[in-house]
């Protein structure tokens, strides 16, 4: 009887240890601390001028990002590695009580790049010059925290978990021997650190993809006629395998929605 109890205790301990290990290796994305920056706006009152952008998301309305988006300065954009990240911003009413909406806040998704303008001083028009942390926000988002006539306001900002509806989506573009995969609707960290692809043919292994631009990842393999799986690692270290998310009948230009999402 004592022997059985001992075996049960060992099994229970091992099971608990495995569960604990899983929970510590895959933790939910947590918000960062607050930092100071500045914010302007662009794109018009309906944000129609924000479509496209350096992340490659295209139509932000149909992609689900809407009008709460922003172009990031060089210091924040990180050559596209920040595409899809979410930031909470609040206007610093103590620093600018005239143009700030005190107590208001808004969360935006990084969808574009705000290029530097070295012809202008960083504190007088060159708002996106390094090393300034600056957000050029879609106008509807900016007007939630600032008064239109102000034009530019001081802000406090921090990264926060992205909340998305549905699973991660993959749009396959390109041509033979050049698959360009746009990754959208990423929750939690919002941005992708690395990505791999595997075809469905027997013996196929995982092949590393590289960031082409923005949220677009490329492969130089010949994958036509194969079902595709992706192994995606977000910038917080979470990894998900999207097994068979793209069927063998895929064609360039199609988008495939998964049922899996980051936490």
From Swiss-Prot:
Gene3D superfamilies: Expansin, cellulose-binding-like domain (2.60.40.760), RlpA-like domain (2.40.40.10). GO terms for cellular component: extracellular region; membrane. GO terms for biological process: plant-type cell wall loosening. Pfam families: DPBB_1 (PF03330), Expansin_C (PF01357). Residues 177-258 form the Expansin-like CBD domain. The keyword Secreted applies. Keywords: Cell wall, Cell wall biogenesis/degradation, Membrane, Secreted, Signal. The keyword Signal applies. Residues 52-167 form the Expansin-like EG45 domain. It is found in: Secreted, Cell wall; Membrane. It is a peripheral membrane protein. Expressed in panicles and flowers. CDD domains: DPBB_EXPA_N (cd22274). Residues 1-28 form the signal peptide. It comes from the Eukaryota. PANTHER family: EXPANSIN-A15. May cause loosening and extension of plant cell walls by disrupting non-covalent bonding between cellulose microfibrils and matrix glucans. No enzymatic activity has been found. May be required for rapid internodal elongation in deepwater rice during submergence. Belongs to the expansin family. Expansin A subfamily. This is Expansin-A29. It comes from Oryza sativa subsp. japonica.
